[in-house]
């Protein structure tokens, strides 16, 4: 099998930047309701803010005082619209039965039949899907590729971060070599802090 898991990077913040003609990789922008207190949780921050050391889903008061940033009011209807447009662009290439929407900014695609159909390989196909997402939304995507949903998701969460092209790829061998001993194990999809100590034994 071949599954591709696609994630839209800092989705809410990236949509807000795209709608303003700004680059989320160079723009400090926070999605949070400014009418609430400094205890308000930031729903999203741009990659530029992450690079400056700001943690995702922090409170507004936790942003270091030296960092200047724009604040965007959350617009869930707009994010759902953009998400729908992106999924629509994928559905021009794959059948609905082979696409599973996991969340507003993430989906799984059973790519195996399409690699034969389009005479391509998984990495090239993932790049094509990522490019389509960017063309319709100006939002950058990352991807994980694996023989099943679990390994594709782990490839996305752990390997794609360090890949220059934003694509992580795992097979059974590289999973055992690279993920088996990965710590903290809570980085791995489905392993919550409560179960981690038992699994670590």
Features from the language model and the residues they span:
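Short polybasic/polar patches that bind polyanions
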Residues: 50, 135, 200
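Short, structured patches in soluble enzyme cores that scaffold and shape functional sites
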Residues: 111-113, 145-147, 193-195
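Helix-hairpin-helix
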Residues: 7, 105, 143, 180-201
